[in-house]
């Protein structure tokens, strides 16, 4: 249900994040989002116009990515690249990838090499990885038998600017 909710939000033009329990779940969910968006024509499917990320997934125009390390040499309007920043890809060039920040709309030119070593697909992540991320709407999937500490639930439940939804399965 959390995945379906995120797809519906994306169809409304919203940036989304699905927070899951494990890295394996996150990778599978990210792959699922990419394939779904490609099937709808919402992201680039041509392998010649995509770039491989450090998680092994290929993304292109229209896809959402998250930065996983700080990089002072990559800047936009005086602001440096920081771990947790989320972007929508606008164009994949030969050397650089044009992106828009989901947090503030700023435009970034990010070297392909950095995406290959420092970025992952940004549709899903673990609660530990979501700190610092901002999207329009967030869905949180926790196992019903887990004793998730309150501080982690707070972190997970404060990623969406407009809405945050919790699902227990």
Where on the chain are the PLM-derived regions?
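Conserved helicase motor core of P-loop NTPases
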Residues: 1-101
């Amino acid at each position: 249900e959390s995945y379906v909710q995120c797809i519906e939000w994306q169809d409304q033009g919203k940036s989304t994040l699905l927070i899951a329990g494990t890295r394996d779940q996150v990778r599978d969910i990210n792959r699922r989002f990419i394939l779904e968006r490609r099937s709808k024509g919402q992201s680039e499917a041509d392998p010649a116009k995509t770039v491989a990320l450090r998680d092994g997934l290929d993304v292109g125009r229209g896809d959402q990515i998250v930065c996983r390390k700080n990089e002072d040499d990559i800047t936009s309007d005086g602001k440096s690249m920081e771990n947790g920043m989320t972007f929508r890809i606008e164009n994949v060039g030969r050397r650089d990838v044009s992106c828009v920040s989901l947090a503030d709309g700023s435009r970034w030119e990010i070297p392909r090499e950095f995406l290959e070593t420092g970025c992952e697909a940004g549709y899903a992540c673990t609660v530990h990885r979501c700190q610092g991320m901002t999207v329009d709407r967030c869905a949180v999937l926790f196992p019903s038998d887990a004793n998730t500490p309150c501080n982690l639930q707070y972190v997970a439940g404060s990623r969406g600017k407009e809405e945050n939804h919790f699902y227990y399965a």
